[in-house]
Amino acid sequence: MKESNLVGDIRKLFVDFFIKNGHQLFPSSPLIVKDDPSLLFTNAGMVQFKHVFTDASNANVGTAVSSQKCLRVGGKHNDLENVGYTNRHHTFFEMLGNFSFGDYFKEFAVELAWSFVTKELALNKDKLYFTVYHEDQETFDLWKKISGFSENRIIKIKTNDNFWSMGSTGPCGPCSEIFYDYGEDIEGGLPGTPEEDGARFTEIWNLVFMQYNRKSDGELCALPKKCIDTGMGLERISAVMQGVHDNYDINLFKDLIKVSKKQSGNTNNELAHRVIADHVRSAAFLIAEGLTPGNEGRDYILRRIIRRAARYVYMLKYDGALMYQIFPSLIDEKSYAYMADYYPELINAKDLIISILKIEEENFKDTLVKALPLLEKELVGLSSGGVLPGDIAFKLYDTYGFPVDITLDIIKEKGIKFDEQGFYDQMDKQKERSKLNHSIKSVQQLKGKLWVDIKEHYGGTKFVGYEQYSTRAKVLSIIYEGDKSTEVANVGDRVNVLLDITPFYAESGGQKGDTGVFNVIVRQGKELLSCDDVVEVLDTKKVLDTLYIHECVIKTGSLIVGDIICAEVNCEKRKNLCANHSATHLLHYVLKSVIDRSIIQKGSLVSDDKLRFDFSYGVALTKEQLTLIEDKMFSLIRNNSPVVTHICDLKEAIADGAVALFTEKYEDHGVRVINIGDSKELCCGTHVRYTGEIGCFKIVSEASVACGVRRIEAVTGQHAIDYFREQEKMLHLIAESVKSPIDNILIQIDKLNRNNQELKQKLSDAYFSVINLQGIATDKIGSIDFLYSSLNSVPIDVVRKFINEHLVNDMIMFFSNVVGRNVMYVIGVASNLHSKIKATDFVEIIGEVIKSKGGGNNQLAQISGEYIKEVDVIFHVKNKLINVLRN
């Protein structure tokens, strides 16, 4: 294998060739598509240029080249279940592509393709074949002229395989594919023949000629600006260049599989190693873009990928997490699997990737251990061609969280079919059983129709809360009980109120809604001299994006549709909200600056009394890191930097470095950017004018909330001062309790702890004496010393400690400890006996007798339950031991 045939070198060769031929290099767009709701992930090179293809006449770029990260899991393109079983399917892959947006068309596209494969790649011309759409005589003639091939090497295809379209309407056109012949040793026929599904002839490049626009009636009209979109799978062309027929035999995958085999200690089961190698890449890139395993949307796709790989790790009989040990090859310059030169995000997020892979795989192992034996038991009576009942798969999914796609994987390997309809019938029944969900949905539907009607009638609410805290407004609508309109609300009524204009911020972007009051000032055209009609605003929500709904209670008088009111925001709460929201932006910036630049916001809550910030990070922050964060925050607050807001187009904001959240929806035009020093974020929330208004900042907690997600809770301003005072008060109380001055408190506590430990040891020694005095019986069962005793009210930790200190080889210790009407059984088994019997084995036997459950490990386990005569339990324990020795 030539050194220039490495995957990274082929990528560079492609990119450099097209740059040399006048193309502009575009970096890979993210896998997570943020502006196309029809796609979960980027699945082709043309995705980032979709808007250009649909409006090529106004394109500001003529030609482009890219190597695009792609993921095909879920939706129309889903290769997950095929990975490992075929030579060419991957979840993650790279697509090399060159593009023209009204610049050049077929002839130059064909010339470039021919030049690259025959000169740059130096492929044997005798190994190449072309396909064209059967009505595309122009491309047929171009290939014939440029390549000099005879007509039997240029194959006309009548199917839609050679006609590409973006959808049922829109840009479309014929395409031409380049095929590589692997030779007669491999089965398969030419494209268009009955044997075309064989592996001999492999498509290596697809050239799409977008020359038509398909109308809704199916008519094809010529596009004013014709475009080129090509795609060449990097892994597939690498296999050709490296002289192998299987993508998993290229250097990149061989290195990943090599590490998988070495770390697992299992060189067999090639299928498992292939799946693991593929899924490590997919998971790593998704985590690098900020995803964490979850139960919905893209997060669930990531979880499925990791769990599918974890199941194959389990098949290797490897006792531990494996994926995180394979990932470092992707960022190791000495490895053929090295990808971080082109995708530095892998290095930036390496700690997070390693942490999430390890934690998620370890967590799923528990599910596998419980669920797999149950599935295997159900499959015992099924032979190849049999059908697994859908209710069994549903039980595994519903009770144990065992993904149905993994069940499908397992039965596929055994040639067993799946009762898919039965599975979904059970899913439907579960939904029907959930009356709560049904009722909530019904209410939402009623509310939804009401608000749609209101929006159609009145339009959206004008929000003026960025500039002012109060305004005159007109009451447009009053709603009660969620879905009923009324003209009048009286004292004590709780209602939702819609105004034509409001200074009240509606909850969104993590920020809580404003509270405050309405005072009626004009009724039926008459100015009111006194404020007898007062409405308290408890919260403000947003419905259908533009309706600001005020949740209110009538405190005095009444409220009538048509009233003119003075709407006043609670200024103190709003100022606290502003301080906490600006502090959240600064915290995001500081975390990226001083902890890890790959950190991504996963969620936030901004209320008037605290802020909460969730972020992607795999391990707990140290005390030193938390102090560093606070110091940096204090510095930014003291700088008293101005908070600058400006409005611009979304693309302009992103290009300028503004942080956007994939969980939020943004308009293409008129997005709001908040600049606080070097922090830039798209945000619709309210903020302070200067950072000094935040006052101070204190972290009150830092903890894990999900796999790979940490949460910081903090307070600012007066709430931070109150927190400091509470801590000081607590310190004084502790000092009084331990009878020590504050500056000597740690020494005094240390002294008390030492005294406490000495007393605990004396108490433990006393209980040890009690255990010995109560008597320990010994039976010889084979070569094993079986020691047992009945105790009364001895602390369980003392019993466990006694066993740990006295257990020796060839010994089993069994203690019952009666406390009131309950009894605790503790069993210790010497380590040299674990191959025959474990402490948890006895727990299972005792559990059957006393109808209870326990736990522990191989050496020490315990179980408690209602007291039963001692002899009964000891009999079962001894009987279990005798049966083990006999077998």
Swiss-Prot record:
Binding site for Zn(2+): 581, 585, 683, 687
InterPro entries attached to this UniProt entry: aa-tRNA-synth_II/BPL/LPL, Ala-tRNA-lgiase_IIc, Ala-tRNA-ligase_IIc_anticod-bd, Ala-tRNA-synth_IIc_core, Ala-tRNA-synth_IIc_N, Ala-tRNA_ligase, Ala_tRNA_ligase_euk/bac, Thr/Ala-tRNA-synth_IIc_edit
Gene Ontology MF annotations: alanine-tRNA ligase activity; aminoacyl-tRNA deacylase activity; ATP binding; tRNA binding; zinc ion binding
Primary localisation category: cytoplasm
GO term, biological process aspect, one: negative regulation of DNA-templated transcription
Alphabetical UniProt keywords: Aminoacyl-tRNA synthetase, ATP-binding, Cytoplasm, Ligase, Metal-binding, Nucleotide-binding, Protein biosynthesis, RNA-binding, tRNA-binding, Zinc
Top enzyme class: ligase
Role, per record: Catalyzes the attachment of alanine to tRNA(Ala) in a two-step reaction: alanine is first activated by ATP to form Ala-AMP and then transferred to the acceptor end of tRNA(Ala). Also edits incorrectly charged Ser-tRNA(Ala) and Gly-tRNA(Ala) via its editing domain.
NCBIfam families associated with the record: alaS (TIGR00344)
Domain writeup: Consists of three domains; the N-terminal catalytic domain, the editing domain and the C-terminal C-Ala domain. The editing domain removes incorrectly charged amino acids, while the C-Ala domain, along with tRNA(Ala), serves as a bridge to cooperatively bring together the editing and aminoacylation centers thus stimulating deacylation of misacylated tRNAs.
Protein name, entry field: Alanine--tRNA ligase
Source organism of the structure: Ehrlichia canis (strain Jake)
